From Swiss-Prot:
Phosphothreonine found at: T174
Organism: Thermobifida fusca (strain YX)
Keyword Metal-binding in annotation: no
Listed name of the protein: Chaperone protein DnaK
A Pfam family of this chain: HSP70
Biased composition (Basic and acidic residues): 495-509, 521-535
InterPro entries the UniProt entry points to: ATPase_NBD, Chaperone_DnaK, Heat_shock_70_CS, HSP70_C_sf, HSP70_peptide-bd_sf, Hsp_70_fam
The organism's taxonomic lineage, starting at the top: Bacteria, Bacillati, Actinomycetota, Actinomycetes, Streptosporangiales
Amino acid sequence: MARAVGIDLGTTNSVVAVLEGGEPTVIANAEGARTTPSVVAFAKNGEVLVGEIAKRQAVTNVERTIRSVKRHMGTDWKTHIDGKDFTPQQISAFVLQKLKRDAEAYLGEEVTDAVITVPAYFSDAERQATKDAGKIAGLNVLRIINEPTSAALAYHLEKEGEATILVFDLGGGTFDVSLLDVGDGVVEVKATHGDNHLGGDDWDQAVVDWLVERFKSSNGIDLSKDKMAMQRLREAAEKAKIELSSSTETSINLPYITASAEGPLHLDEKLTRAEFQRLTSHLLERTKGPFFQVIKDAGISVDQIDHVVLVGGSTRMPAVVDLVRELTGGKEPNKGVNPDEVVAVGAALQAGVLKGDVKDVLLLDVTPLSLGIETKGGVFTKLIERNTAIPTKRSEIFTTAEDNQPSVQIQVYQGEREIAKYNKKLGVFDLTGIPPAPRGVPQIEVTFDIDANGIVNVTAKDLGTGKEQSVTITGGSALPKEDIERMIREAEEYAEQDRKRREEAETRNNAESLVYQTEKVISENEDKIPEDVKNETKEALDGLKKALEGSDIEAIRSASEKVALASQKIGSAIYSQSQQASGAAAGGQQNAEDAEVVDAEIVDEEPKREGNS
């Protein structure tokens, strides 16, 4: 049975893990790193670059490099490249495809099944978009699970007894805080809250804004209008943020950042940890609201928290650690987990649970936001309250607002506001064919069904006629089935193009190596190669060099074969010469040995003569 992987599809970085012998293992990518930047770029030749290679070329290819696309999941955002529109699902699928390839290279087998994690506070539309991304990448998404739940599973699996765990998850682009009860193989989420637009990217942006302001006041030039300069500033800001986690001061030095009439200008600033914390204090403040809301929703006090687990690279910032310590009444956050990897490890464990490889583990997750419909007066009527354990199903009876109303429109929302329009609209559908009747008479049963992925199915049924209409809510930004199928085909085409490009690069590299090696052999063995063989080989080499100047891969292959055949003749000639030389040497050596024997006899007798006289 093929193994399933666990994937943490992050805003900034992504990680893939797998169970080996019952133990979770983080899989290193093709570049040897355990995390892969969630960056996708389109090279000028159309090649799709993913990960570190895409991140490295971002400065010189700003317009065609996409990062932090997770922040656009579940929206109608698109990027236009080479005459094509790419959705967040497609861009995420490129990242997932790379993780899939790296896992297959590591395991030596095809990978199709995966558990993918999402922020706990992701809406239905964002969850569905993540599932679609997996499908486009050629993955069968076994389950979408919440990142804090996954982290708690990884953290507590080997521990004994029951405990209440607070997971504080601050990633590159999203923030969640969750309270979970764990024990006896059960991981139960009590409450969750968060902010899907708060993360390390915002800390970076605060530093970028500060640098732009400083440079403007010093030089009178606004760098925010220069896309290439802004990309360099973003990279420098991220580096400075990371350095300030272990140092109290860092230098930001960017030579030739721009130019004025007088010549090139350089950026050189010092940033202290204290100044960095002042610049970003408003961001830290935004994490407090969700924390207090979770404590309130779970109905516990801070002193009932047994363990605090920090998740996400942004929790390495000292100010974040200090704040968590302060909020939890002085509790020391656990240092035993890797904040970058723990979510993927938990996802691999959940994949093992679903495949039957891990026994006696049960995840009880919750829906992060209330679900309901719009009723008369624009009121949001909740059918399922937030923090309800999933999977779940709830029904309620509604009626018509007008006499002889032939249909009702069901507008589905997700959120906490009392007025429907202020919440996130997930979808709309109509129940038609209601028989004429006075208002208030028809009975329409609306049922919400949330599956274990947190994805919603809504059914409206006229109890009088038995007529029913249902829809799987996938959000206003959801992709139609035919679009997903088209994107799957396109992803496969890109993968095929990439495979061809890799083959072409290998063919070209092998050909160049063959030229070098063959010329080296000729130069080192000039006297041993017959003139006709030498001329034939040089002619073949000239043909290969000419082919390498062009782009016809078949011509390069054909020319390489000719050089290889000619090289074999060189090898035969050298081998033949060596054999003749060694044969002659062996004959000469035999004569020498015979002569030595005769000499030895004479020399041996000489002393006897001397001794007798």
